[in-house]
Amino acid sequence: MQISAQFDSGNINVIEADTPENIILEINQDNQSDFFQWFHFKLNNNVRTEHIMTIRNAGKSAFVDGWENYQALASYDREHWFRVPTEFDGENLTITFTPDHDSVYFAYFTPYSYERHQDLLHQAQLDIDCQLQVLGQSIDGRDISVLKVGEEGENKKVIWLTARQHPGETMAEWFMEGFIDRLLDEDDGVARALLNKAVFYLVPNMNPDGSVRGNLRTNAAGANLNREWATPSMEKSPEVYLVRNKMLETGVDMFLDIHGDEALPYNFVAGCEGIPSYDERHQALEESFKDILLAITPEFQDEYGYDKDEAGQANLTLGATWVGEQFKCLSYTIEMPFKDNDLLPDHSVGWSDNRSSLFGRDVLTAIYHIVDELR
């Protein structure tokens, strides 16, 4: 029996693994940070033997509420992931599983590899409407890439989407994959109509270093990128610095920042009600977008979410609030669950890579219905 995490986005520390019924593990902290919650490891096992794996530091993780009613994910082939029995006692997260094959992977959520990220970018650039632009490099020397889809034009809107500021929120890049696939589908009428009205700038992975390192929330310098937007720097947060500069160059008429939430088992949005310039026009745009999304898909709801900011009290270090204030535009954080959508549960897979991708496709429809209202 062996346990390994020496691969892209791997994260686990083996404390004890002498017998299948008493495997003791710990999640490693993000580098230069106290955050931890993402895990991803491989178990070479005793087939048809019950394995009991206890992550003993789960109770000290970044979001302890994220373990309540949570079920870990497993896969034999790294393509098809399914939920497995998992319990949390306030301190320990215990995964109990009897494998049918010699090797099995476990993860906090379905991983989105750096290799797949490269495939997404380079397959997209083959489309005549798409350009792959490299804005610069991360601290570890990885490209900060943006896909430009469509062309600027008179009265055309500029729409930005970013994902994986927090690298452990892999559902965000699955969302982007679905969004991009649909936007580039020449047979899709919604996509074609949108590209007549808007140009898109899409960043599928804002934090490639943290993704490869197996971090939950930080980049290679230990920075939480979604707290860097007010004063980014090339030394600490080049990812935000480069993307923000590009936004200042292009302008922004709409921005969606795609995330995952550890605790809440729902899809929801967080808006800009606390920014200094928030007004009736901005509020009307936000309400319109939510109403459209509610009409499009039962995967979205607006009853559960974050507490709204008081007037003038928004944290402008966040991407969505900084963009909303800087460009006076519709700017939302979209959150998806690590657990399941409790309003439409799937006990086999929970919220999943495929459901994230389909939700991304649905959001394209919502943008189509609101694009004419943006300015």
Feature locations, PLM:
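Short, loop-centered acidic/histidine patches that primarily coordinate divalent metals
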Residues: 56-58, 335-339
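A short, polar/proline- and glycine-enriched secondary-structure boundary/capping micro-motif
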Residues: 62-69, 116-119, 156
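Short helix/loop capping segments that flank catalytic or ligand/cofactor-binding pockets
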Residues: 63-64, 107, 114-117, 169-171, ...
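Extracellular structured ligand-interaction cores
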Residues: 38, 103, 222, 329-331
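Extended acidic/polar, glycine-enriched regions
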Residues: 87-138
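His/Asp/Glu-rich mid-to-C-terminal helical/loop segments that flank catalytic regions of hydrolases
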Residues: 343-375
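Active-site/substrate-binding loop(s) of hydrolase catalytic cores
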Residues: 131-149, 154-316, 320-324, 331-335, ...
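Extreme N-terminal flexible tails
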Residues: 1-100, 104
